[in-house]
């Protein structure tokens, strides 16, 4: 039995046991995370560390920088920064602060200098992200769990561990999605990825 499948079976048995003990919310959350992790190309440790990086980064942003709209997305220890800041200096300072987190390998700083976007623009970005992901699912050429989509001001950022073919397919689908003005690839390419 494949290690991932064995993990899923053991996890589901544990979750059922918790359900029988009345711990439904905890079990439901755990089941969702386990299903995502089984199809993820990152190791469980890296998956968890990506979550930790995002929490640490948010903490640093709240502590040091006020009134900024910064999104922090970590995938395989590579961090993407999107949003708006009031100055080029603050953009650099935020990038440096995130780079100093111990486990971060690389920071792609796509922060733009200017005023914060309006709520309607952010809602539109969420809608675009949903449309891109829906097109990924309908296309079926790769798992939606292999490509993370972040949209900011109409720009779709694509992250993941992918083969060249998967990256090209994801880029083309995102590029031709209504509302997307630009696509930025933040992929890690691995031919071995197609075997997982």
Question: Which functions belong to the PLM regions below?
Answer:
Residues 10-22:
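Bacterial N-terminal signal peptides
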Residues 2-7, 22-196:
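N-terminal targeting leaders
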């Amino acid at each position: 039995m494949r290690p991932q499948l064995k993990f899923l079976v053991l996890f589901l048995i544990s979750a059922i046991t918790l359900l029988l003990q009345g711990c439904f919310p905890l079990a439901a959350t755990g089941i969702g995370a386990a299903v995502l992790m089984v199809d993820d190309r990152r190791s469980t440790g890296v998956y968890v560390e990506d979550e930790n990086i995002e929490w640490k980064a948010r903490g640093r942003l709240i502590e040091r920088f006020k009134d900024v709209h910064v999104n922090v997305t970590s995938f395989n220890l590579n961090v993407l920064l999107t949003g708006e800041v009031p100055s080029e200096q603050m953009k650099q300072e935020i990038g440096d602060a995130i780079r100093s987190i111990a486990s971060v390998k690389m920071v792609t700083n796509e922060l733009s200098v200017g005023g914060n976007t309006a709520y309607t623009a952010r809602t539109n970005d969420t809608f675009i992200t949903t449309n891109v992901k829906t097109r990924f699912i309908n296309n079926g050429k790769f798992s939606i769990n292999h490509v993370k989509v972040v949209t900011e001001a109409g720009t779709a950022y694509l992250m993941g561990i992918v083969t060249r073919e998967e990256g090209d397919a994801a880029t083309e689908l995102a590029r031709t999605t209504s509302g997307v003005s630009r696509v930025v690839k933040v992929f890690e390419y691995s031919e071995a990825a197609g075997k997982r």
